[in-house]
Design a protein with these regions (language model features):
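Mature extracytoplasmic or organellar-lumen-exposed domains after removal of signal/transit peptides
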Residues: 7-19, 23-172
């Protein structure tokens, strides 16, 4: 026999896997549900970033305004604190993460766990499905807070800044 020719053989599994893989229909429906959530989550993050930038800009405008010092401080302070609380619910406490301490589960931690369900060889498990559902529920609870900040709180602060003759720092 030659060593360089083709040789047919059968591969026998050493052991059976513990988990049975999911069927394509289940996997695909999970993947679609995850993608819908991913788009929603990404849009919430984008709005959060825009809100943070506006708060920072409005703070600069208040510092440069010709009105009495501190007049806008309470409104801006409350908006900033509300924004930080929302960020904590979405991503966990950044200070805790920085020093390696565990955070309570956030939308991000549930999303990451749910996302790992599409990267496994056997498909999403019940744990992945549960994490995705929790992330969706948490996002639904937090979305009204984000939208209130965007549509009510920040426009109200802008009107107050304009009435106090604060410069428009967004165009500077």
């Amino acid at each position: 026999r030659l060593l360089d020719g083709p040789l047919d053989f059968q591969v026998k599994s050493i052991y059976d896997g513990v988990l049975k893989g999911t069927d394509f229909k289940t996997y695909d429906s999970y993947r679609k549900k995850l993608l819908v959530f991913e788009k929603e989550y990404s849009s919430l993050i984008k709005i959060m970033d825009e809100n943070s930038k506006l708060i920072d800009a409005y703070k600069k405008a208040a510092e440069r305004s010709l009105s009495e010092p501190g007049k806008m401080s309470n409104e801006l302070y409350a908006a900033r604190n509300a924004q930080l609380e929302i960020e904590k619910k979405m991503n966990g406490n950044s200070s805790r993460s920085e020093i390696g301490e565990n955070n309570p589960p956030s939308i991000r931690t549930h999303y990451r766990n749910a996302y790992s369900g599409v990267r496994t060889t056997y498909g999403p498990t019940g744990s992945h499905e549960r994490s995705l559902n929790i992330a969706i529920q948490m996002a639904e609870l937090i979305k009204p807070m984000i939208m209130k900040m965007k549509n009510e709180t920040l426009p109200s602060i802008k009107v107050s800044l304009e009435s106090n003759n604060a410069p428009d720092v967004l165009t500077d």
